[in-house]
Amino acid sequence: MFRVLNNDVYSPAVVQQQTTLAFGKASSLCTDNRSANDQCEMGENFRESGQDHIKRPMNAFIVWSRERRRKVALENPQMQNSEISKQLGYEWKRLTDAEKRPFFEEAQRLLAIHQDKYPGYKYRPRRKAKRPQNSLPSVSSILCNQMSVETLHPFTYRDGCAKTTYSPMESQLSRSQSMTSSLLQKEHHSSWTSLGHNRVTMATHIFADFPFYQSLEPRLSCAYFPY
């Protein structure tokens, strides 16, 4: 008879029933008793991993959004997690200070429990994995470097309502071009004035030589001299 009882105790059905009863008792303790509920929350949220990682204590927003997220997810099963987070953030901002006060008090209580359990705790954020850099520079990086060199010290000029930004190299080029254009204009003007002066002097010499002018044929009113 002892062997029969022993076999019944260690049968798979009995073991499964005992485990379900144990988990049912644990869940009832977490929901009914307040101190047990705190221990369950601390055990779920601040359980140490193999690398001795301690989770941060929950703040007021996380305390509030924990239950609210479940309700929103049940009401909108098609909504994604990112959209739910945006909606929760918007709703949290619209709450008044009086509505937020209970959640801040709960966060302070959880913080005190966390400090008692981990007195020397310091928040150490995880480092992000560095991405491998490519050996050859990309085209975008080369263009960005060129743009940064050209726009190192920009100068802005106003012409009416339009604004144009020039780099130092462009300003020097425009200045040199303006100087050369002004010099060319001066040389062109001086050449035209000298040419006109030569024409005037030539005409005076022709008209001064009156006998020669009278000796021309009657059909010709003037003589043409190529310059």
Curated annotation (Swiss-Prot):
Gene3D superfamilies: High mobility group box domain. Residues 54-122 bind DNA. It comes from the Eukaryota. One of its GO terms (cellular component) is nuclear speck. GO terms for molecular function: calmodulin binding; DNA-binding transcription activator activity, RNA polymerase II-specific; RNA polymerase II cis-regulatory region sequence-specific DNA binding. It is found in: Nucleus speckle; Cytoplasm; Nucleus. One of its GO terms (biological process) is cell differentiation. The keyword Transcription regulation applies. Keywords: Activator, Calmodulin-binding, Cytoplasm, Differentiation, DNA-binding, Nucleus, Repressor, Sexual differentiation, Transcription, Transcription regulation. Disulfide bonds: none annotated. Pfam families: HMG_box. The keyword Nucleus applies. PROSITE patterns: HMG_BOX_2. Belongs to the SRY family. Transcriptional regulator that controls a genetic switch in male development. It is necessary and sufficient for initiating male sex determination by directing the development of supporting cell precursors (pre-Sertoli cells) as Sertoli rather than granulosa cells. Involved in different aspects of gene regulation including promoter activation or repression. Binds to the DNA consensus sequence 5'-[AT]AACAA[AT]-3'. SRY HMG box recognizes DNA by partial intercalation in the minor groove and promotes DNA bending. Also involved in pre-mRNA splicing. Interacts with CALM, EP300, HDAC3, KPNB1, ZNF208 isoform KRAB-O, PARP1, SLC9A3R2 and WT1. The interaction with EP300 modulates its DNA-binding activity. The interaction with KPNB1 is sensitive to dissociation by Ran in the GTP-bound form. Interaction with PARP1 impaired its DNA-binding activity. This is Sex-determining region Y protein.
